[in-house]
């Protein structure tokens, strides 16, 4: 599951976020095509205070296609907890015991508009599911306390990036590389696998 902030402040890196999502979808599709025995499903969410869009909801990895320009138009505030909570609830209802789930959260702002979920509820969900083969990663701009935000939600894998085009591009590239390592580890587990999802904390 990929959860991407679509609030107004993302306008500054809108094109990089849009391109990065499509490149990530392509990475997922390629991995699914190369490993047909590894069942992969994709849920892609973008959110602001006016909507939560499920662009993909448990779609087969080989079936995903790029988003259209009109699918990502930043505006509004940042109901971060609602997006995470509702996404987790939906994906959790679609998984079975033993399934591995990778959750990637990307934002450039603090929570400021949630109505259904609060921090405690999100943290409880994250901590419970981390014990059940779920991996949570949190990516934020370097003007945020990224590690503090993630820790408060029970997430330990973090990455931060500067709010500019070059660093946003580098962030998505780093995420895709780490995603491929994650997939490869699922296909061929190694005793020496690094327990840290991201190779580095900053890009």
Predicted regions and their residues:
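Acidic, low-complexity intrinsically disordered regions
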Residues: 1-203
């Amino acid at each position: 599951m990929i959860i991407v902030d679509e609030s107004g402040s993302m306008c500054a890196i809108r094109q990089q976020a849009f391109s990065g999502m499509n490149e990530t979808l392509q990475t997922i599709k390629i991995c699914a095509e190369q490993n047909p025995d590894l069942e992969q499903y994709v849920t892609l969410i973008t959110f602001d205070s006016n909507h939560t869009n499920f662009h993909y909801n448990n779609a087969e990895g080989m079936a995903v296609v790029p988003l259209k320009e009109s699918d990502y138009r930043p505006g509004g505030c940042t109901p971060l907890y609602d997006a995470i909570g509702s996404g987790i609830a939906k994906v959790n209802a679609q998984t079975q015991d033993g399934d591995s789930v990778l959750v990637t959260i990307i934002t450039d702002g603090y929570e400021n508009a949630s109505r259904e979920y609060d921090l405690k509820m999100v943290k409880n969900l994250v901590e419970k599911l981390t014990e059940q083969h779920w991996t949570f990663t949190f990516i934020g701009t370097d003007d945020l306390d990224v590690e503090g935000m993630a820790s408060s939600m029970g997430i330990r894998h973090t990455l931060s990036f500067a709010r500019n085009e070059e660093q946003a591009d580098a962030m998505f590239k780093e995420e895709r590389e780490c995603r491929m390592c994650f997939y490869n580890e699922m296909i061929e587990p190694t005793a020496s696998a690094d327990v840290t999802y991201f190779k580095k904390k900053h890009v």
